[in-house]
Design a protein with these regions (language model features):
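Basic, amphipathic alpha-helical patches used to engage nucleic acids or provide basic targeting signals
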Residues: 1-6, 28-100
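Solvent-exposed, charged helical/coil patches
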Residues: 1-24, 99-103
């Protein structure tokens, strides 16, 4: 587990922490089944991963996602650049995927 978050992870955590996102409780950097989850909401079985260029064409990510999906999790991935430069698009996508209304 890393001690410091990437800039994109810190930006996403600012949006999610303290139930700021539609009162949904997220935890960050959570060890689970030999993996470290960037952000997880156990109540909704939802994982959010923030990816950099090291994740391009990553078979390891595909295997990891398959294992977590088989345990009932939905995995949503966003690119670092999108979180940092297109925050509104990321939020709209997240609201839509969760079926949530927002102001």
């Amino acid at each position: 587990m890393r001690r410091t978050a990437t800039l994109a992870e810190a930006a996403m955590w600012h949006l999610l922490r303290d139930r700021r996102f539609s009162n949904v409780k997220f935890r960050r950097q959570v060890p689970f089944q030999n993996y470290i989850l960037d952000f997880v909401c156990f109540e909704r079985r939802l994982i959010i991963e923030i990816d950099g260029s090291q994740h391009l064409d990553s078979n390891r990510d595909e295997r990891r996602d398959a294992v977590l999906a088989s345990d009932g999790f939905q995995i949503i991935r966003y690119w670092n650049n999108d979180v940092l430069q297109r925050r509104n698009v990321v939020l709209e996508d997240l609201f839509a995927k969760l079926g949530l209304d927002h102001d």
